[in-house]
Amino acid sequence: MRVLARIPTVNRLRTVAQGLEYVPAKGPAIIAARHYHHLFDGLAFFAAVERRFHIVVTLDWAQSRRSKFLMSMLNRLARWPMVLREDALLSGATQRRTLFKPSDLPRYQLAALRQSVKLLGEKRLLIIFPEGYPNIDPIYTPKTGADEFLPFKPGFAVIAECAERVMHQAVPIIPTGIRYQTGSTWLAQLNFGPPVYRRDFPSRQQLIEHVAGAVKQLSAVQIKI
């Protein structure tokens, strides 16, 4: 996946990063990041993070059986957990809605949860975009502006809880901001923050709100080049 990711970035995207020391060189960890661009966000992580990682991705943007099959195959090879978004299916074209059944939603979510926990149990690095949607997406996004953030969904916190229960080990969650300078070549700026731990928060909701606030603050920071 890393090699394939380099192809579309030639002369289109440069990446700078700050706070990489917060990303552990080994051991289980979750990066909870802003989602701004449907393509460039993942490519920016490939450029900045040397360690192998796995991204929780959506499949509901597929518009044909061929694209669904191809992306499913690639994601399975890369061991990237796949989820579906119910609102994306309902808002999509009729052809896309026929690719998935209502019963697929819980099946995909449960499979993604199990795979994510398994990856963390293998001391892997997992990247999650808790907003669920980028600001820029040619298929569909509920966001209406470049500066808009959506409420964070609880998936990353649930994954951390389940993994910790299985491993009997704390999983660091690294809030990560993303911002871009546009032009003929886009400049991606990744800003990694200090890790937080589930044990430090009285409730899941407080953890989610803290991480969401940290990601928003980190995304506002202009990295000096």
Label the predicted regions.
Residues 17, 31, 55-56, 173, ...:
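Generic preference for hydrophobic
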Residues 26-101:
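Catalytic core of membrane glycerolipid acyltransferases/transacylases, capturing the structured
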Residues 97-225:
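Non-catalytic C-terminal accessory region of glycerolipid acyltransferases
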